[in-house]
Each structure stands twice: as structure tokens, then as C-alpha cells.
Amino acid sequence: MSGIIKKGKDSVSKNPYYMISLSGAYDSQSFWKAKDIEETDNILNKPGLDCIYTDCTDISGSLYFCSDEAKTELEKRLAHIPVNALHFIDSGDYHYVSLLFLQRINRPFSLLLFDHHSDCMESAFGGGLLTCGSWVLHALENLPNLKKAVLVGPADEDKTAEQLLKDSRITWVTEAE
């Protein structure tokens, strides 16, 4: 199945949240599928909130890394999702999808990332391939509107990325700090 599924009784609310499924991880979770408020106490199922679910599980070349073909297809399928919305992006294996939203921001901005990894390493696959571990580096190198990245939570040993970049636009707050 591919496409968009709206969860809600009538029309889409002014402030829906968006779930992007790449692995099918949400299929076994019920918090976003409840039909009635009584079915869950989850905050995402309160009146006035709608879930827009975008199924991208049929896109190959997207697990851990993003091939050029997968990136093109994801950009098409995610074009309906506003940048300034709440996005649930599958698992950490697909962190790079954040870059697809960041590249649509057309004014100066800062990135605040809470993660155990910096996600700003050069691709282990070479050739500048976009991966779940390299998307912040891609953003810093290619998005002129990204003025600062604040990374909160990387392991102390992940400071190798900071040495690699020597970029004054990055602020680190490691897990030990």
C-alpha cells in the first residue's frame, strides 16, 4: 500500500501531525489508529488532532541510506507535508528524511538535534551518499540557510565529527555534559 491515509472523523484539522512510514514500524502500534478517544489516552488522539499517514514502505534504497532514486521519490511523496508541522519519521534508520524537510526552509534557521549520535559523519559508503549518520553534514555543506546546528546528547567519542568539520556553526553538548 502506498499513499496517504487520514485518521479523523471529518475534515483534517488545522494542525494535523504527520506519520511517515518507511519500514512499516507503525503498523503494529495502535496509538495513532484509535477510532475513538476512549481507545487510548495518548495525546495524539485528542479532539482536533488528525494524523496524516504517508506510506513509503515500497520505496527501495531507503534503509540506512538514501539512493538518488529513493530521494527523488521521497521528495515527491512528502511534498504535501508542511515543514512547520509535527513529523514522526519512522525509526532512526531514516533520520536523513529530516534533511528533505530542512532543504525546503527558505529563510535562515538553526537546527536543534537531540540524539546519541551526531549524524554528521562522512558516509561510510563513500561518494557523498546520504545516510542516517551523515544527514547533518549534508545539511551543513549544502543548505545556506542553516546557520547553526546544536547537537545535544552525542557520545563523547563522537567528537571526532567535530574535528572532521572544524565548523564554528556546530555547538556540542555531549551526553557527559
Language-model segments: what does each one mean?
Residues 3-177:
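Conserved alpha-helical scaffold segments that buttress catalytic/binding sites
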